[in-house]
């Protein structure tokens, strides 16, 4: 399965290390590989890790984010902010924009992609705009039969989950946490750029977009 891990040195250092990014995921594949909901082999062409991180950055009296010479200097302030359970940022893979724009994840039409998503602290709701999850291994368990055709799936805090999707059309897809406040305002979003030929049998534009007229 896929599992979350995090630093746990003891006491208040546990949350401090975790909210400082000292966490991730590990994947252990079955000896015979993954199978779909019907028990047939399911092979992926690419696997991408989405490490979701909540950050709690302190601000000064003027509302600007504080800077510290070393991490331990900000420990007390960060822990105080974190007690409110309201993150200043929720990001993928370390920072806002880490997986968007020029840093977008890549793929091709016809490829199957496995997304591994972890969150050490908070619940998350992954969602692929323009697609969905063909298969979801709930709770990250590869020993269980995957569920199928999820629009949005769930990652409980302190766990990792895996989802697979076969891309059938080219274009830009957005993978995000479907708490849209966190996705749009706090940074929990990634881009997936898919190359290939458009398939009109899947979707066809019958009329070019134009102005909306009022009658």
Task: Name what the model sees in each region.
Residues 1-215:
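Copper-binding active sites and cupredoxin-like electron-transfer domains
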């Amino acid at each position: 399965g896929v599992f979350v891990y995090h630093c746990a040195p003891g006491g208040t250092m546990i949350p401090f290390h975790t909210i400082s990014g000292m966490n991730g995921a590990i994947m252990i594949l079955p000896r015979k590989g993954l199978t779909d909901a019907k028990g047939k082999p399911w092979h992926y062409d690419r696997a991408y890790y989405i490490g979701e991180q909540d950050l709690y950055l302190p601000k000064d009296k003027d509302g600007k984010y504080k800077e510290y010479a070393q991490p331990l200097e900000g420990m007390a302030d960060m822990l105080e902010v974190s007690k409110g359970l309201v993150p200043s940022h929720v990001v993928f893979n370390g920072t806002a924009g880490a997986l968007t724009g020029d840093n977008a994840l890549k793929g091709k039409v016809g490829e199957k992609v496995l997304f591994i998503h972890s969150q050490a602290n908070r619940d998350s709701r992954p969602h692929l705009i323009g697609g969905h999850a063909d298969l979801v291994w709930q709770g990250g368990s590869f020993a269980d039969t995957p569920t199928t055709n999820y629009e949005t799936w769930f990652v409980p805090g302190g766990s990792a989950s895996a989802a697979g999707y076969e891309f059938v059309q080219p274009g830009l897809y957005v993978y995000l946490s479907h708490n849209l406040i966190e996705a749009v305002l706090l940074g929990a979003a990634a881009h997936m750029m898919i190359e290939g030929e458009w398939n009109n049998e899947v979707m066809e534009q019958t009329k070019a977009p134009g102005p909306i007229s009022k009658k």
